[in-house]
Curated annotation (Swiss-Prot):
GO cellular component terms given for this protein: extracellular region
Name of protein: Complement inhibitor RaCI6
Protein's UniProt keywords contain Secreted: yes
Signal peptide span: 1-24
Main location: secreted
Length: 102
């Protein structure tokens, strides 16, 4: 009986160490940024037709302007959007559908 208790204690200790290692390695990894959306402002200004358009925001970035909608000339901040990959699967009816991987 003592050997069984020792074995259970050993398994619990190994499991706790494994879980601790998983969490500590995740915390030490930094997010890699490519910098295309950082520390650059985007603008909302009128085009040649007088319509307010947003400029200075490349694909993959979001321009957030903290000004009222009626303010035509305004500056904003760019944020990088997260990217996800989608996979296409075929349903039983034969029509393709798009699903996000978990």
């Amino acid at each position: 009986m003592a050997a069984l208790n020792g074995l259970v204690l050993l398994l619990l200790t190994i499991s706790a160490m494994f879980i601790s290692e998983c969490y500590s390695s995740g915390e030490s990894q930094s997010i890699q940024r490519n910098g295309r959306c950082e520390e650059v402002t985007c603008q909302r200004k009128p085009n040649h037709l007088g319509v307010a358009v947003t400029s200075g925001c490349p694909p993959g970035c979001l321009c957030v302007i903290q000004a009222p909608d009626n303010a035509v000339n305004a500056n904003g901040t760019r944020y990088e959007l997260m990217t996800t990959t989608t996979t296409k699967t075929t349903t039983t009816s034969g029509t393709p559908s798009s699903e996000d991987p978990e």
